[in-house]
Amino acid sequence: MDLQSLGKLAKEASYELAITGSEKKNAALEAIALALEANQDKIVSANKEDIQAGKEAGLTEALLDRLLLDETRLAGVVSDVRSVIKLDDPVGEEFDGKLLENGLKLSKRRVPIGVIGVIYEARPNVTIDIAVLSLKTGNACILRGGKETIRSNIVLVEVIQAALKSVGLPETSVQYIKSTDRALVGELLKMDDYVDMIIPRGNAGLQKFCKENSNIPVIVGGIGVCHLFADKSVDQEKALAIVANAKVQRPTVCNALETLLVHQDIAEEFLPKLHAHLAPMGVTLIAEEKAKAILGDKATLAEAGDFDREWLCLNLGVKVVADFHEAIMHIRTHSSGHSDGILTNDFTIANKFINVVNSAAVYINASTRFTDGSQFGLGAEVAVSTQKLHARGPMGLQELTTYKWIGIGENLIRP
């Protein structure tokens, strides 16, 4: 596969997208939504082939769940596409305007980034999310999904390209690297003549490889070792409901809860309640020594490294901490910087938690599952960034733009 040609075509498409108005971009998104509905059987059939191949390859149930794109999930994707249509287009927005003493009218204007390269694993709905948000913001994209969903992704991109053609936009606005040759990832990372930003969505190994080998700015994130700290003042019954939601609702995603820290003053009372509440849901508690002593055979003793793991299943790490300080030190040591929260009725402690926990999303008395583009009102997201530049947290429309300075004068010359 000639990636250089892909890059050149994407760059050319990005120039046209950059000057395409909101009405036409929204028409393209509606065409994509209609095409996804019209091609549902074809898409679901391709996904079933991917699922069957995954089963034959011995993939875990957690990973197979990530691969799944059935009728229900596809309907959710289509709904997300239409939600993005309703969002304001950030491109062209002018802000920080001012008139300088030298007579220059100066402002910033939001513009597309250009060409976005996204390398991702497993979830085929990511293909739609990235394409839609890129198009809405006037960006072209080059996609490289995992081999596990190759059939689903190829069909999805073909559907998208046909929809783009139907409204008069370049099919090459969204392109897919069909080869599963891993060497092509390294080649893509060197294409700084054509690609303006790389977003790897996958495991720590993929993200490390991209950071170390890319000539292009890389946005990392999506690894979620997420924590909740049950403080001594917590409403225990309400806390149980939040913990269950954060862990059980969808354990295979990056905003699922992986570790619960429990203040020692409530541990004897709270941990048995926790087990009674979660065990019927299939949750296995992985406990450090103090928690294990309280829970006995109702928990499995944690091993070295367990509190650094993104379980992506119904395992939940549990640790008893002496106080607020120990909870913070544990989070600083083991959190991936994705989403962490505190469950408490002491809002002095809650505000202190917000100030000292350095994660992309920090919660008071809420589930970590809220860290999501649609839940944040952003529509779908291309990624959840855990770094501080250029974006942080769910990356929606605004995070897929940059800005340029606009200076307007009346035949001004610099004094």
From Swiss-Prot:
SUPFAM superfamilies linked: ALDH-like (SSF53720)
Gene3D superfamilies: Aldehyde Dehydrogenase, Chain A, domain 1, Aldehyde Dehydrogenase, Chain A, domain 2
Principal location: cytoplasm
This protein's UniProt keywords: Amino-acid biosynthesis, Cytoplasm, NADP, Oxidoreductase, Proline biosynthesis
Keyword Oxidoreductase applies: yes
Domain of life the protein comes from: Bacteria
GO cellular component: cytoplasm
Cellular location(s): Cytoplasm
PANTHER family: DELTA-1-PYRROLINE-5-CARBOXYLATE SYNTHASE (PTHR11063:SF8), GLUTAMATE SEMIALDEHYDE DEHYDROGENASE (PTHR11063)
Function description: Catalyzes the NADPH-dependent reduction of L-glutamate 5-phosphate into L-glutamate 5-semialdehyde and phosphate. The product spontaneously undergoes cyclization to form 1-pyrroline-5-carboxylate.
Name by which UniProt lists this protein: Gamma-glutamyl phosphate reductase
Organism classification: Bacteria, Pseudomonadati, Pseudomonadota, Gammaproteobacteria, Alteromonadales
